[in-house]
């Protein structure tokens, strides 16, 4: 398992917006995947200097889901929310 992706399940402790932002490294953007999962990524990763590394695992999750997104590669850390999970009430 990659240290660049955090997985949140129904059994995971509550995840707040602040915790999500701290993990991802800034403001987060939620991408809803076709398979029902959601992924949180750093909204401003592409304009940061230095640029965060490509997150191969998160990019693969998005690409395999069949979801079209405006970004080719996910940069930096990401959080994957299992289908039906919305943590922290935000």
Which sequence ranges carry the predicted segments?
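Detector for the mature cores of small, proteolytically processed
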Residues: 1-90
């Amino acid at each position: 398992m990659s240290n660049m992706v955090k997985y949140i399940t129904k059994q995971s402790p509550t995840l707040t917006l602040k915790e999500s932002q701290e993990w991802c490294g800034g403001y987060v953007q939620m991408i809803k995947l076709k398979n029902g999962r959601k992924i949180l990524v750093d909204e401003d990763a592409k304009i940061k200097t230095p640029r965060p590394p490509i997150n191969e695992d998160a990019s693969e999750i998005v690409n395999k889901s069949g979801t079209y997104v405006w970004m080719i590669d996910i940069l930096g850390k990401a959080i994957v929310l299992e289908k039906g999970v919305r943590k922290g009430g935000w």
